[in-house]
Regions:
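Sec-dependent N-terminal signal peptides
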Residues: 16-27
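N-terminal secretory signal peptides that target proteins for export/translocation
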Residues: 1-13
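Formylglycine-dependent sulfatase
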Residues: 27-281
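Serine/proline-rich low-complexity intrinsically disordered segments, especially terminal tails, linkers
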Residues: 5-8, 19, 30
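Structural motif marking the loop-to-transmembrane transition
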Residues: 12-16, 33
Length: 281
């Protein structure tokens, strides 16, 4: 049986490589305050060639790992999306944190209850231009509201100089989060397939637009001459499992190992009735 996460990480790795190698050429320009690129990939586990998984095609991130330091024992404060991102971006442990944790913090911040800066706010206070593109905090683009595009509801106030989320054919950031090709959006009333292999370019999915936007911003920031902290968040391999067909074709003749534990766990605490996964066709 093929591993879903294995198949769908190759597109994101291709996009990541372009950003990383563009940035590496700029690091020497700001020796005292080097430029910093943080790359977040949603739901990507360490099923990569550089972690010993030899059937995965991940040459670009493998080169990145070989040129730096790869962590083979790494732990996070929380196993869920919003809580883990909260901890990463604030340095705080928030027991019981859910996906709205950063919005909770924003409310406390506005009320004067928090004095510690967030990670990007710290860089901002020390002379960096800070920019967020894609899904860095829980909401792509960092805004709240029905479609995650209300500028009056900011997930991380006083943190980012620029916060961007290209929406393309998907209308709004909420649509981008649950996107399939040709502007299709999970939760819009149409029952969609959880799998999709679309015969198109990288921009057929939001991650292609995110990478394209990030590359343009890096070039613009480099021309400004000031140091920057840029965070770029890719959405795949989060549900739904859609990617350009050219990446899936790399695995056409690949025999992936069977899933180690294919059956439902015995104990209820180990099983979740996913509200996302169960709503696809």
């Amino acid at each position: 049986m093929r591993s879903i996460n294995s198949i769908y990480n190759i597109e994101t790795m291709h996009l990541v490589s372009t950003l990383v190698f563009l940035l590496m050429g700029l690091l020497s320009l700001h020796a005292e305050k080097p430029n910093i690129l943080l790359i977040c990939v949603d739901d990507l586990r360490p099923e990569l060639n550089c972690f010993g998984v030899d059937y995965i095609h991940s040459p670009n991130i493998d080169r990145l790992a070989a040129s730096g330091r790869a962590f083979h024992n790494h732990y996070v404060n929380a196993p869920t999306c919003g809580a883990s991102r909260y901890s990463l971006l604030t340095g705080d442990y928030y027991p019981g944190a859910k996906n709205h944790a950063l919005f909770d913090r924003a409310k406390q911040l506005n009320e004067g209850g928090i004095l510690r800066p967030s990670l990007p706010a710290w860089f901002r206070q020390h002379g960096y231009t800070t920019i967020s593109i894609g899904k860095v905090s829980h909401h792509p683009g960092g805004l709240g509201g029905k479609d995650w595009d209300d500028p009056s509801i900011v997930e991380m106030p006083n943190s980012w100089d620029i916060s961007l989320q290209p929406v393309g054919d998907w209308q709004h950031p909420r649509g981008v989060m649950h996107a399939l090709a040709e502007g299709k959006i999970w939760g819009s009333g149409e029952i969609l397939s959880v799998f999709e292999a679309f015969d198109g370019d990288d921009q057929s999915y939001p991650d292609g637009l995110i990478a394209e936007t990030a590359i343009k911003q890096i070039k613009k920031l480099d021309a400004s001459g000031s140091p920057f902290f840029m965070a770029v968040g890719f959405i795949r391999p989060h549900l739904p499992f859609g990617a350009p067909k050219k990446y899936l074709d790399l695995y056409a003749d690949c025999e992936l190992p069977t899933i180690a534990h294919p059956n439902k766990p015995k104990h209820p605490s180990s099983w979740t009735n996913s509200g996302e996964f169960m709503r696809y066709n």
